[in-house]
Amino acid sequence: MKDDHDKEFVISILRNSGLQVQPIPKATHQTPDFRVMMPDGDVLVEVKSKDDDQQLRNLLKSPKGTPLSYKVSLIETCIRDAWRQIHDFPNRDEANFTLVWFITRKVGGITVLTNSFAMGLLYGTELLEGRKVGRKEFYRKECFFFRESIFFSKKKCKDLDGVVLHDVQSIKLCLNPYSPRYSVFKHTTLTNVFRVKFAVVDPEEMEAAGECFIAYCSVDREDKNGIVRYLKSKYDLDTVKIIRFVPFNYPVD
């Protein structure tokens, strides 16, 4: 869901950051919301937002100890629909960058979809821990593209350059390293504004800094053992354990 207030709010953020924004008039065909005009090229942007989360409301009303089994298909559909609005835009140039701005939680909203949760949908992240070969050095790091994800899948959002995750606490630009324009988009005026004023998630920069692992391989994402073998070989890992946290309804008495 999205209303005009969301779009105008995002436009005001960008304009206050010194960027030139041109709203795109509504038409009978699919259109993105606006265009960010830069010396590096234009960025077509579609804004989407997450309303109050009925799944979380159901959990809060459930018996004590009930785990949350979260269905992410609606979120993925929302992002794919946003991408199609950009992709099918008749005035889109192949050189245009593409960006989905996703408001994951509004002020006063109730949702489990925090930015960290949404990042898992984009990047297929898993938290891994274990020890390295020989030195037995302990590690705990996130692994990008360990499982199927929006950016990894060529069928979901092909050549989408990035997604902005926006909640009441932070605004992050998540770069897609699988986009054919990744190496250019990461150095654009828009991305540089995010680096200075907000935040940028760039898996390759994080890997170079030793902050994460990346499963850059063609192994089927259903083959977890195959992914683990790849990571062990790439990073000299001895043991690999997946760490997952599941929300439960445990009210404070």
Name each model-derived stretch.
Residues 34-36, 43-51:
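Conserved catalytic cores of phosphodiester-cleaving nucleases, focusing on short active-site segments
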Residues 42-43, 99:
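Beta-sheet entry/capping signal
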Residues 14-39:
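A short acidic/basic microdomain associated with nuclease active sites
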